[in-house]
């Protein structure tokens, strides 16, 4: 019942006080079950039907889908329930206590992005959801900060096909209609160890990796020359060498060397094509040294994403906000939601505060975000 729904700031406070960290390191990783229970209770109080979905392959993680209304189409509002880990020594405040100071709300997840659910709940407390003419769906996903397992699983298993979706990531209320993808790979070279006094008796993995890196750099230059999307601030696919490790002693021929790298493809570039380009680039090394070079995924790949610029969702949101949609270089769950329906990324707070010590959301976003949610629900679910 709506009269038992807590005030906006208390909802926000409860969300921040409920840890839901995602991490690849098991000791840091946390279940989001408690947070899902909170959200499920609140949306039930608003009259929504609530379904909690276990996400396979995770450490006790769940999605939640709250729905109201009947028929086809409608609107999906979605976001992730998890946060990144925090560096205790760099925070000046308790990350799990919502702190109001200097027109800012501080806490882990205030901007990225647990707070978005407080905005949705607050905007809907005055809406009679029984009178909506089209369905309204609220999706809370798991593990966005690591594998995006929640969004991947939901998009593969749901039969829902809303008219459109909005992901409430922190965009400073600037609507985003496209972003790059992300592919992270590990290149491994297996050499043959031996005493450094006789190099011919071994195969130095560092030397082979040096050769491989030269070919990878040629691929980087080729991607920059062949592909272009003017709307992006970095208008070409980027390739970054992020981490390398090999060997264990100066007087020993290096037996193993490992390189971690990523590629951020433009929308429209297929992941299979990029994998093919990387394998082609490394083919000369593999041919010279059969069986000594392998490439594997570090994390599941994320494709690039683009919402058609002439879609009704883009037109409506641009009109409501009085601003044009934009594109960004970072990734969200949008590619997976886009398989269900046209999707925009649009939410309160700045991406510059995401993953930072003393994360905060400026209070100036509160009123316009509440108004925006009310307006898009009215447009897509009442008309």
UniProtKB/Swiss-Prot annotation:
One of its GO terms (biological process) is L-arginine biosynthetic process. Keywords: Amino-acid biosynthesis, Arginine biosynthesis, Cobalt, Cytoplasm, Hydrolase, Metal-binding, Zinc. The keyword Metal-binding applies. Zn(2+) 2 binds at residues 112, 145, 355. The active site is at residues 82, 144. Binds 2 Zn(2+) or Co(2+) ions per subunit. Its cofactor is Zn(2+); Co(2+); glutathione. It catalyses: N(2)-acetyl-L-ornithine + H2O = L-ornithine + acetate. One of its GO terms (molecular function) is acetylornithine deacetylase activity. Its main location: cytoplasm. Pathway: Amino-acid biosynthesis; L-arginine biosynthesis; L-ornithine from N(2)-acetyl-L-ornithine (linear): step 1/1. It is an enzyme of class 3 (hydrolase). Homodimer. Catalyzes the hydrolysis of the amide bond of N(2)-acetylated L-amino acids. Cleaves the acetyl group from N-acetyl-L-ornithine to form L-ornithine, an intermediate in L-arginine biosynthesis pathway, and a branchpoint in the synthesis of polyamines. NCBIfam families: AcOrn-deacetyl (TIGR01892), PRK05111.1 (NF003474). Belongs to the peptidase M20A family. ArgE subfamily. PANTHER family: ACETYLORNITHINE DEACETYLASE. This is Acetylornithine deacetylase. It comes from Salmonella typhimurium (strain LT2 / SGSC1412 / ATCC 700720).
